[in-house]
């Protein structure tokens, strides 16, 4: 009940801010004119960018499973990714994603699939934190402090430090990962997970670098997708400013526990807050964030649910 209640509260708060904005009529007119002028090409591009980012995610999943000689078609990997999205839609911080990813693996390999999902999450968090660390240098924290309170700058410095520390911790993890898995494999109280640690040891540095590279590419695709949607709605904002705002928003979504179906509330609040230093068209920013959520979160979850119910794929054998 907490999640829906929070969503209602945030929605009311945002509605109040937008409805009382003196620029509401002007922003709405700007959006309507730009949609009419730009047509449907840019929304189509943003849809293709959604498919591209999940294609990249499917390549990552195929790559990491290949480390333990699990070979599959790209299309099968993509279906597993979408299935994971359908489960993650109703779980905190998308923790249910592993269920969809491993549901088609043999029973004795589900533990390995779960461990690989966690590893993939670590890769994603490390990239989001790295991007946030860069974004903090581009972000206009002074303007945000003037809009909120004088202590905002101090909080931004703390969050920047947190992003740097998490990034540094992830780098250390990737450097020592093999020794860490050997330690876990030899730990007496973790003996029953020996096969999982042994599988994780097969993730070499080449695989890690490829996964990091693909995750960086996927994140840049997301940033570009936001910029395309904002341009379609007539929001006058540069790509660098979009990069800063989106990177910080993704970082916020990582560190704050939430559920996908109420995540839209946080996206609204983050977008309204972070982009307010770059543009006055906050209605366009809010609509853009909603469109991206529908494309990147809701639509993949629906596709995944469809495949799970109507088009089940065969179990994958090594």
Which positions does each model-derived feature cover?
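Membrane-embedded alpha-helical segments of transport systems
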Residues: 87-91, 115-137, 290-302
């Amino acid at each position: 009940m907490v999640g829906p209640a929070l969503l209602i509260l945030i929605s009311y708060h945002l509605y109040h801010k937008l409805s009382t904005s003196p620029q509401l009529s002007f922003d709405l007119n700007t959006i309507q004119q730009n949609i009419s002028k730009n047509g449907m090409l840019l929304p189509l591009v943003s849809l293709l960018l959604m498919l591209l980012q999940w294609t990249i995610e499917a390549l990552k999943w195929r790559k990491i499973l290949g480390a333990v000689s699990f070979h599959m078609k790209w299309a099968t990997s993509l279906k597993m990714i979408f299935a994971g999205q359908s489960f993650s839609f109703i779980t905190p911080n998308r923790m249910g994603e592993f269920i969809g990813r491993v549901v088609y693996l043999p029973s004795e390999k589900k533990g390995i699939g779960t461990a690989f999902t966690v590893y993939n999450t670590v890769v994603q968090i490390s990239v989001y934190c790295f991007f946030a660390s860069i974004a903090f240098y581009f972000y206009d924290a002074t303007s945000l402090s003037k809009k909120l309170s004088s202590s905002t700058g101090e909080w931004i410095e703390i969050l920047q430090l947190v992003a740097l520390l998490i990034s540094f911790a992830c780098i250390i993890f990737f450097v020592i990962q093999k020794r860490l898995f050997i330690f876990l494999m030899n730990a007496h109280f973790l003996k029953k997970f020996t096969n999982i640690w042994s599988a994780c040891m097969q993730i070499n540095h080449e695989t890690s670098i490829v996964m990091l590279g693909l995750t960086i590419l996927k994140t840049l695709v997301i940033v570009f997708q936001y910029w395309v949607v904002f341009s379609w709605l007539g929001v006058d904002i540069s790509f660098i400013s979009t990069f800063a705002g989106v990177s910080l928003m993704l970082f916020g979504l990582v560190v704050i526990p939430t559920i996908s179906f109420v995540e839209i509330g946080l996206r609204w609040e983050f977008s309204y807050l972070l982009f307010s230093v770059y543009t006055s068209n906050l209605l366009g920013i809010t609509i853009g964030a909603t469109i991206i959520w529908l494309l990147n979160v809701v639509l993949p979850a629906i596709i995944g649910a469809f495949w799970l119910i109507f088009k089940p794929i065969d179990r994958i054998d090594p």
